[in-house]
Amino acid sequence: MNTILKVDDINVYYGSIHAIKGISFEVGEGEVVTLIGANGAGKSTTLNTIAGLLRSKTGSIEFMGQSLAKVPSHKIVAKGLALVPEGRRVFLQMTVQENLEMGAFTQKNAGIAQDLEMVYDLFPRLKERLKQTAGTLSGGEQQMLAMGRALMSHPKVLMLDEPSMGLAPILVEQIFEIIQNLHKAG
């Protein structure tokens, strides 16, 4: 198994609060990995640190054999590592299509239309709402939009932070079915 992501002894602080204490793990190519812990255990902080939104005081993070120590978050996305943040965090005043296009900032214009179709195939509901502003979507639709936006960057690793938070059980089932299908598709 090839290691695609390696997190080694990272320590993250919020001011004087030691939020992440020496966490280490590896993700192999093709693996699905879950971070499990109580509220406040540091799961979101860990994902945000890997994505370059926070910095570790010590330790290292390597993606595909390259250090991410001083790499800005937008370049981490361009390398193939995308985060779907907790709470969806879509651009509420922008349309569905505009939100998806924001996720394609790493792509050349020629491929964006094809990428949009790929996302619309995964999430047909988004195609029905492509001109609608994201703020008017349901929670489940916003989660689909956040996932679709991340997929527009062609990630090699897709990190999902609380993908089922606040969703009805039927929507949770749909989201996890899509995650399984993405895993099978590679």
Task: Say what each PLM segment does.
Residues N2-G186:
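Glycine-rich phosphate-binding loops of nucleotide-dependent enzymes
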